């Protein structure tokens, strides 16, 4: 009797492992490759046939002719292999110092192009990290704050830059989830294409 139960248990383990450990993942992977090829392969963005990044992960743009991303919570910064959130609460002194440093940097970087810029005009996403620590999107408000700098450095009209921001702004998911966002990598690539 014990032998029969042991045999049935072993057969169940082998069958369930084969079905849920091999067959089901293979079918789902195949379906994803066919139906969602771009997403299944990391939502990669290419330039001149070379992969330059992903729609899903931020990367650093420090040069003034590019739009800048929001702060990163990963170590080293913008490391997609170490996505994390800061876990700092609103009463945290460390968070206050990070935000104050980010505000000072924004005022230094954007202030000369936006005379009279005040702390209250700086969007929250310009000085805080995202939940993943490497969010590729910024708010349209943060993009608009940077538009004058990018236009001046690239010798473009402000209208041209704002048009590129608008063209690279994604709406809410399904029309009502989340907030509109601007993918920084895609916007910067659009700027490079415009200059070419």
PLM regions: where:
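Flexible, solvent-exposed loop/hinge segments and secondary-structure transition points
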Residues: 12, 20-21, 26-146, 153, ...
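Membrane-entry signal-anchor segments at the cytosolic-membrane interface
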Residues: 1-19
């Amino acid at each position: 009797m014990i032998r029969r139960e042991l045999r049935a248990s072993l057969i169940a383990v082998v069958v369930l492992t084969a079905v849920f450990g091999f067959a089901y993942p293979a079918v789902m992977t195949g379906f994803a490759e066919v139906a969602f090829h771009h997403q299944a392969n990391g939502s990669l963005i290419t330039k001149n046939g070379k992969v330059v990044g992903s729609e899903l992960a931020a990367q650093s743009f420090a040069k003034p002719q590019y739009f800048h991303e929001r702060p990163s919570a990963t170590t080293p910064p913008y490391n997609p292999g170490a996505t994390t959130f800061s876990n700092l609460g609103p009463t945290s002194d460390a968070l206050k110092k990070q935000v104050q440093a980010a505000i000072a940097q924004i005022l230094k970087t954007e202030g000369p192009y936006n005379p009279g810029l005040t702390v209250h005009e700086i969007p929250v996403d310009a000085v805080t990290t995202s939940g993943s620590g490497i969010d590729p999107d910024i708010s349209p408000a943060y993009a608009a704050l940077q538009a004058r700098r990018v236009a001046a450095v690239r010798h473009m009209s402000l209208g041209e830059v704002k048009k590129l921001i608008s063209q690279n702004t994604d709406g809410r998911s399904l029309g009502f989830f989340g907030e509109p966002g601007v993918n920084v990598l895609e916007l910067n690539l659009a700027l490079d294409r415009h200059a070419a």
